[in-house]
Amino acid sequence: MRYIVSPQLVLQVGKGQEVERALYLTPYDYIDEKSPIYYFLRSHLNIQQPEIVKRHILLTLRMTQLKGYLGNLLDIKDDIIIYSHKNNLEYSYVDNTIFNPFVYTQKKTLLKNDSFLYNVYPGACDFLVIWVARACDTSIPEFGSYEDVDNNIIKFETMLMEVFPQLDLDITVESKFNNIFRTNLKLTGLKKIIQRVQDLDINYKSLLSRYDEHFINMTGNHFILNDEQLNLSIWDLDGTLALSSDGDTVMINNVKLFTDLVSDIDTQMERIKGDITYKVHLATPINSRIKLDIETSFIFIETATNNILLSSDKKISIILAKNHISIKVKNHIPNIEKYFTFLVIAINAMFNSVQKSADFTKVETVYWSRICQNTKNKNRKPIIINYLDPGMKKISNNFYKSDEKEVFINDNGIMFTCMDPLGKYNKVGFLNIFHDMRKYCIPCCFLHDQSHRSTFSSCVHQIDVEKKIVSPYILNFGKVVTESKMSFLPIIFDAFLNDGMTANMEQDNKRLKETSGYHIVRCCAGDDIVRLRTTSDIIQFVNEDKNILIVNDMVYFPMNASDIGKKIHILIQEIVHEVMIVKKKESSDKIDFFPPNYKLLKDLFPKQTIQTPIQSDAGMVLTTDGFYIDGKLFNEDLSSKYVTFTKNVIASDAVAKYFSPLFKYVISEAKDRFIKTWMINIMIHMNVDPNNIIPTLEKYYPNSGRAQIN
C-alpha cells in the first residue's frame, strides 16, 4: 500500500480573523481534491483556489521551531501567535479547552508549552491546519513572539522536496498494536459497545460484568475473575478473546472489530495511551546503517547503535533493517508509524543511497574500545601483524597456530594475533554478539583456548552454527527472553528453587562457565507467544495448560492437585516463559536443558483432599471439587445474550482471617474461589457452632497455607 503524504494548511488571518492567505502545503504538484484538507477549505472556509506551495511542515518540530518556520514561510517579521481550531498548540487553558487569541478569557489559567507538534496535535499526520495571526491584531498582543528560523530545518526541507519524487513509499504495516492501551473508557462506553455487538447480530459472545474485589460473577459464557470492578469481554466466533476492557485498560486482539464497534458511537473514550509496536515492511530495501550528514536533531537522535534512531522527545524508537522498520511508540498517534517510515526512507535517499562495505577495523573501531578493550591488567585487543612466523601450523585457510602464537586472517587479508605482555590473553577468539547479529568475525583475545566455541567453528572452519543456539550469558530477570537467551529467576524463586545447586560464572561477567544443574528462565513456552494480561487470563491459562505458573511473587496452580503437570512457567512482561534446569560443561559452549524440579512448588499446593460433598438436594451436589447435577459436573455454556449481576457473598472475619495467609502466596482457579465463597456461606448457615468454624474448615481444607508459612 502506497503511503500518501497528507497536505497541510496554513491560514494567515487579519484583525477580524478573516483569512488573508491560505497556503496549501504539499510535496506533490497538485491539489488532492479528495483530501479532508481541501474539503475543509471548500466547505467551511469557502476557498476554492488556495496558494499551492511545494513545502512540508515537519511534524517533529517544537512550537518555537514551528513558529520560526511559519514566520519564514509567510515572510512575517513581526511577533505572531499560532493556534488551531482542532488542538491547542503554543497556548492552552488549564481545562484544555481550545485557545483562540481573538476570544481570550482571563477567567481561565493559560499555559504555554514548547512540546512537539505530533504530540500536541495527534491527528497531524492526516489533517494539519495551523492559523497564524500577527500578535498586534489580536486581543492579547503581549502573548506574541518572534522566532528566528532554524536554517538546518529549511536546508533539510529543501533536500526532502528534491528527493521526494524518487521515494518508494510502498509499505505494509504488519503488526499495529501490542494489545494494551490506557484510556478513560467507563461504564457508559462499555455498555454502548456491548449494545453495538448485540445490534450487529454477529453472533460474537459478549460479557459485561461488575463485581467487588476478590469475588466472582458467573455470567455469559465464561467464569470471569478480575481484580478490577468492571470488565467487558468479547469473543470471536472461534472462541478467541477479541477484546477486553476493565474500564481503564483495553486489550485488543481483533483490531478491525474494535474499530467497527467504536467508529460511530460516542464511547466517551479520550486519547488512548500505551506502548505500541509497529512493524513496517518496505517494498524497496534501505540502508539499515544510517548516517546523517547534516544537523537533524529536530527529527531524530542518533544512538551508539547505527541502526537505531530515537525521536527528538526520545519517546519513539526506530530500529532499521534492510527490508523493514520496527517503530515503538509510547502513546497512540494515528499513522505516526507511516510518517516516520516516510522520513527514514527520505533520509536514506538523501544520505545513504549507496550501501558501502568496509573492513570492521577501519570503520567500526569504536566497538573494540567498548567490548574487547585493554585495561591495566587485561590486554584483550588484538594487534595487526604483517607476516606469519616460520613453522606455524595451518589450521584452516584463515587460521594459523604455533606454541607461542595464534593468527587469524580476515577476508581483507589483515592478520590479527594476541601478544599480551603479561602472558595471559594470548588465545584468539571471536565476539559472539557481532557474529550473532551480522555474521561478522571480530577477533578478540581470551585466557583460554576458543577452538571448542561455536563462533570459532563458524569463523575458522566455516561450519554453520545452529540458529537457535543459546548464549551462555545469563541475563538479569525482568526482560523478555528470546530463543537464544536465558535469564536468572527472580531473587525469591532463585533462592528457593536453586537451594543446594550452584552455577559457576566467569569472573566479572554473567557468562555461565559450568554447572551440573541450575534453574533459569528460557524463552516463551511452545511455538506461539502467549500473553496473559488479567487475573482471569492467568487462571484460564493455568487450568487449560495444567502446569504451575509464577507471576511476580505468587504461584498459580491448576484447580486440582492431580492435574498439576511437570512444567513450571513464569510470566515476564505479560509473556509466558518456561523455567528449566540448565547444564553446561566448562570445556564446551553446548548448553543442555532439562525439566525443572516441579515438585518443590507442587508440594506447596494448598488444597490436597479427596472430593467431599458439602450439600445436596434434588440431584444437585455441591462438593469441594465442583457442582454436579445428576452426577455430572456442571460446565455448560450459559447464554451471553443477557447481563446478570450477582450479589457477592462476604465471608465472616473468622473465615477471612483463616484463609488470608493462603491468598498472600497462592491463588487457584475462578471456580475454586467461587465455590469456596459458596461453600463457606452454606456452612455458616448450616447451624455450625461459631466456636467450631476452624475445625470444620480444616476438615475440608487441611492445608490452609499456614504450615508452609511457618
From Swiss-Prot:
Organism, as annotated: Vaccinia virus (strain Western Reserve) (VACV)
Spell out the InterPro entries in the cross-references: Poxvirus_early-TF_lsu (IPR007532)
Molecular functions (GO terms): DNA binding
Subunit notes for this chain?
Answer: Heterodimer of a 70 kDa and a 82 kDa subunit. Part of the early transcription complex composed of ETF, RAP94/OPG109, and the DNA-directed RNA polymerase.
The disulfides recorded in the entry are: none
Q: Name one GO cellular component term.
A: virion component
Localization, per the record, is: Virion
Matching entries from Pfam families are given as:
Pox_VERT_large
Q: Which family does it belong to?
A: Belongs to the poxviridae VETF large subunit family.
Record key words, sorted: Activator, DNA-binding, Late protein, Transcription, Transcription regulation, Virion
GO BP terms: namely: positive regulation of DNA-templated transcription
Q: Does the keyword Transcription apply?
A: yes
The function of this protein is:
Acts with RNA polymerase to initiate transcription from early gene promoters. Is recruited by the RPO-associated protein of 94 kDa RAP94/OPG109 to form the early transcription complex, which also contains the core RNA polymerase. ETF heterodimer binds to early gene promoters.
* Keyword flag DNA-binding: yes
Principal location? virion
Spell out the protein name for this chain: Early transcription factor 82 kDa subunit
